[in-house]
Regions:
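PLP-dependent class I/II
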Residues: 1-264
């Protein structure tokens, strides 16, 4: 379970998380909360970083009801690679002692420990900042990505939205824009088209690359969705990238010999 997905950039509400926690209690299952984008939420960034309210994690929501329901159904995983430096490849976990002890034992048997240099770097930074400094830092990172999101989406709206080539939901956290491309049907089993064929063939040849949605679907079903990222692309290249993507979608309709249908 995640608050903000690395696939679609969608974010679960606190109420939705409470419903899932209730199901975990009812059906006796464990929630593995993989949440590397928790600190990259774009709401509330004009407020004080130390005192402002932040979204609740599954772990935090479970703690709220400790006396009534108890705890132990959530193991939470976070990452420094999204908020300090991608090259650190360092994260941390929070959860029941028995489970984390088993994780430690498995780590000791498999790779002994994470690399020492990234660990020391993260320790020194966190020790220097303290909690207030850390919260100010992550909010500055979130503001950086929020600005990139705004520019990226504005160009997408201008190029893809106005031409009827794609639609999406504005991400409120993370670094991805999940696009539903308006593609011609590739057969009765794929009425909305196949983004993998489009990206791997036409888009790649045009010099633009997005991750086909099939990469994130467990059963490998074909889909019209693609994942685009606004994390590192140069802002001057965004419009051109979307223009190339638009053109290959329009070319797919022309090749199919059909007029492009309006988006629902």
């Amino acid at each position: 379970m995640v608050s903000t997905t690395a696939t679609a950039g969608t974010t679960a509400s606190d109420d939705r998380k409470r419903q899932i926690l209730a199901l975990a209690r009812q059906h006796d299952f464990l929630i593995l909360e993989d949440d590397p984008y928790y600190y990259l939420h774009f709401g509330g960034l004009d407020e004080d970083a130390v005192t402002r309210k932040r979204g609740k994690s599954y772990w935090g929501l479970e703690e709220e009801h400790r006396e009534r329901w108890g705890t132990g159904r959530v193991v939470r995983f976070e990452s420094f690679s999204k908020i300090l430096a991608a090259g650190l490849r360092l994260g941390f976990a929070t959860g029941p002692t028995e489970i984390l002890d088993a994780v430690d034992a498995n780590t000791a048997m498999s790779n002994l420990q994470p690399s020492g240099v990234p660990g020391v770097m993260a320790y020194k930074l966190l020790n220097h900042w303290g909690i207030p400094g850390f919260l100010r830092h992550v909010d500055s990172v979130a503001r950086y990505y929020a600005k990139r999101r705004d520019n990226f989406e504005a160009k997408a709206r201008q190029v893809l939205g106005e031409s009827g080539v794609a639609q999406w939901v504005t991400p409120v956290a993370g670094m991805f824009l999940w696009l539903k491309l308006n593609l011609p049907s590739s057969g009765p089993e794929e009425p909305e088209g196949d983004s993998f064929a489009l990206i791997s063939d036409k888009a790649k040849a045009a010099g633009v690359l997005a991750v086909p949605g099939v990469a994130f679907i467990p059963d490998g079903s074909k889909t019209c969705y693609v994942r685009t990222s606004f994390s590192i692309i140069e802002e001057k290249d965004v419009e051109e990238a979307f223009c190339r993507l638009r053109d290959v979608v329009l070319a797919a309709w022309k090749e199919a010999g059909k007029p492009m249908r309006p988006l629902a």
